[in-house]
Amino acid sequence: MKQHNILITSAGKRVVLTRAFKDTLAKYDSKAKVYTTDMNPEMAPAGYVSDECIQVPRCTADNYVELLLQICKEKSIGLIIPTIDTELLILAINRLKFEELGVVVSVPSMDFVAICRDKRNTGQFLEAHGIRIPAEVDKYNPVFPLFAKPYDGSLSANLHYITKPEELTDDILNDPKLLFMEYIDKKV
């Protein structure tokens, strides 16, 4: 039997996305449901518009994949829609486990996720395909303004717009995860 139920992970505030899947799914299968997961279902607005919001741990938890597999079995899930970048690699790595249950996981290949999760790899990929990116800046001989961001960052955390030497602190200079790049003004 074909499984039409959908699971949207880390639903959070994704009310529009959840409603869009519910509305579209209803046109094809009136009995199908859209489930959501979140670490804090009571604080996840999308959970209130889904058919059910199920509490799960952070995607880095040892039991995360097993819990999702269990949810897929119990709720007859046919499609998983991840919504945060940190879930992509773990789901890509475990794609076959889901496919064995007849579940499609909407993620690219592990190799492509690895390119996207590391901004150094992303830059090399883009340049190899003829797409210009901001130039790297030597942090010990900087040209201002510059922009520093973690190569593996997410959610705009630990971003630094640096306009003058005194803003380039030792903490920033010594952070091994930061990439230093020319600042591109939005007016350009």
Where do the language-model regions lie?
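Short loop/helix-cap segments at secondary-structure boundaries that form the rim of catalytic
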Residues: E42-S50, K139-F144, D170-L173
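ATP-binding N-terminal substructure of ATP-dependent carboxylate-amine bond-forming enzymes
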Residues: M1-S106
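Short secondary-structure boundary segments
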Residues: I84, P150, E182
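Short beta->alpha connector loops
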Residues: G12-R14, D85-E87, K139-Y140, P165, ...
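Phosphate-binding site of ATP-dependent enzymes
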Residues: T163-V188
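A conserved helix-loop-beta module that forms one wall/lid of the active-site cleft
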Residues: E99-P165
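Short, glycine/acidic-enriched loop or turn micro-motifs at the edges of active sites
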Residues: P41, D152, D185
